[in-house]
């Protein structure tokens, strides 16, 4: 399965920062992923079924959690799920306890496409605002001031075309050439989505 967001420059930057240990203990992370396709989905009989936005956008968010933290044993639960304009869910919030705590929100009702990621930690915070395809995309790191105060921050702003598909395709070709295949990620994502969907009873 192609989860191309892993190749977003700021996703790679966030992963490197998390793995560096410079942030200290990671307390919690929240992500929002929204687009404005509710009417398109409603007009498509095969798309406006089942768990709706959950597998559509939620799969990318859960994959991002795996990419950042590599935790395949994490369990998610539904917090909020709505059908504002669609037969299937057009808004979902799911969460996961543990370290760090995770909150993921996805919707088809964000009329301007948008993505955010906020990581709050012992030594500060790190933030992604938007994706390259919707640009500009900004990565911001804030360093905590003790005992309190406005933190100094450093930002990197990218205005460019979406580089992820070409990078993902190059990665795919390298896997084909080496014969290395691992379905653990896909199994984990599908299991998490099914568990959340089943907890809503869908009907």
Kindly label every feature range from the protein language model.
Residues 9, 13-17, 64, 93, ...:
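Alpha-helical elements of Rossmann-like donor-binding domains used by nucleotide-donor carbohydrate transfer enzymes
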Residues 117-119, 134-149:
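Short polybasic amphipathic segments
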Residues 97, 170-203:
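C-terminal helix-rich "cap/oligomerization" subdomain common to oxidoreductases
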Residues 48, 150-157:
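Short glycine/proline- and acidic residue-enriched helix-loop micro-motifs
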Residues 5-76, 82:
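Predominantly a Rossmann-like dinucleotide-binding segment in NAD(P)-dependent oxidoreductases
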Residues 62-135, 166, 170-179:
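Contiguous beta-strand/loop segments that form the cofactor/metal-binding neighborhood of enzyme cores
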Residues 156-170:
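Active-site loop of classical SDR/Rossmann-like NAD(P)-dependent oxidoreductases
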